[in-house]
Amino acid sequence: MTLWINGDWITGQGERRRKTNPVSGEILWQGNDANAAQVAEACQAARAAFPRWARQPFAARQAIVEKFAVLLEAHKAELTEVIARETGKPRWEAATEVTAMINKIAISIKAYHARTGEQKSELVDGAATLRHRPHGVLAVFGPYNFPGHLPNGHIVPALLAGNTLIFKPSELTPWTGETVIKLWERAGLPAGVLNLVQGGRETGQALSSLDDLDGLLFTGSASTGYQLHRQLSGQPEKILALEMGGNNPLIIEDVANIDAAVHLTLQSAFITAGQRCTCARRLLVKQGAQGDAFLARLVDVAGRLQPGRWDDDPQSFIGGLISAQAAQHVMEAWRQREALGGRTLLAPRKVKEGTSLLTPGIIELTGVADVPDEEVFGPLLNVWRYAHFDEAIRLANNTRFGLSCGLVSTDRAQFEQLLLEARAGIVNWNKPLTGAASTAPFGGVGASGNHRPSAWYAADYCAWPMASLESPELTLPATLSPGLDFSRREAV
């Protein structure tokens, strides 16, 4: 029984699915997808649970969410192992994901009060009050790269705001989704407040097409995000929050400390085997001897990165990709760029055929025409050389995406210029592109999102504002508007 609907664990009636470890091939999870009728049942359960959940005092909702945080801490080792085995990422990185999930609770509570709490302004004849109300029933679509943390970034603020939810994890990480939901069950969520439906495209389409949804919160690829946007077009009454990918530039302008710059680049491009939406995909390096030395050192150090199993001891910096098919897609993207005229500086290599272990690749594309403006979700870094800083900014902005952008430079003025001219939701200076703070918004422009950033701003799309003018009693104004006459006439 792998679906959780209205507080009950039930068996899916859709397609049979199994999840294997992307490196060892071990079967980790088996179950059936939710069919359309079960998806509708989950929505009905969420709708029925909404009035009571929304009317709960905030403190009552907060108490359950905080109990979930306690359970996450108590089961940190177990959840770390599930995430590591299911995604292929090393245990150390899976552990940081669970820590991020735990930290999200306190941050989301603070954000709720800061972004969507109650504010009151006293007036001469009463008060003006701002309150916030939950949308109702929301669908949450989770990604596979952070199958615990990223859905958590939607689920926690949505529950705090008083919404009820239907959660569909990625079909590539059903085990993590189920494990997290079992912790929510133990935290004491009332039946129907949070529902789990497993499945792939058909389940997702059934969920996103439900008439009774009040909104959809999505993290994933641009192609799926665009599809959801088209599907919900003409329905302005539904909130749609899209967090999509990027073709992110990292500008290397000043590399006086070459090893520090190389370390920052490795963290930006290859952490999580390149499977973070903020990962650097395009490396822009200034022409000249300093840039040459930086690239040579980058190729040298990156060439020593050996992806390992999730359970290796000592642990590796990167593990496997989410699947052998994902690794093959990266290889095909590299070969495509070579065919266009790219010069390979470091060839990616499959460590073992049939697994998702893939070494990093670096290819120079300076002067190459018609390079696809796409997000290759893996450890492939494209290099362009530039002559002056204005050209670097032009190259950085030469993308339909706008998620993250970074600069390595000792010149504050260059960073100030980048802040003014970059089209990206995250712009970092001498920090990895993959570094983000939950106390700040997280999102992008262009094909990277629809202006609904998450993290600190997630509270914004989980509730709508209600403005009120209030007075405890009704009195006739001392001064009337022109043309109004309230004088009493004598009876004839």
From Swiss-Prot:
Pathway: Amino-acid degradation; L-arginine degradation via AST pathway; L-glutamate and succinate from L-arginine: step 4/5. GO terms for molecular function: succinylglutamate-semialdehyde dehydrogenase activity. Keywords: Arginine metabolism, NAD, Oxidoreductase. Its EC number is 1.2.1.71. Pfam families: Aldedh. NAD(+) binds at residues 220-225. It comes from the Bacteria. One of its GO terms (biological process) is arginine catabolic process to succinate. It is an enzyme of class 1 (oxidoreductase). The active site is at residues 243, 277. InterPro entries: Ald_DH/histidinol_DH, Ald_DH_C, Ald_DH_CS_CYS, Ald_DH_CS_GLU, Ald_DH_N, Aldehyde_DH_dom, SuccinylGlu_semiald_DH_AstD. The keyword Translocase does not apply. It catalyses: N-succinyl-L-glutamate 5-semialdehyde + NAD(+) + H2O = N-succinyl-L-glutamate + NADH + 2 H(+). NCBIfam families: arg_catab_astD, PRK09457.1. Catalyzes the NAD-dependent reduction of succinylglutamate semialdehyde into succinylglutamate. Belongs to the aldehyde dehydrogenase family. AstD subfamily. This is N-succinylglutamate 5-semialdehyde dehydrogenase. The gene is astD.
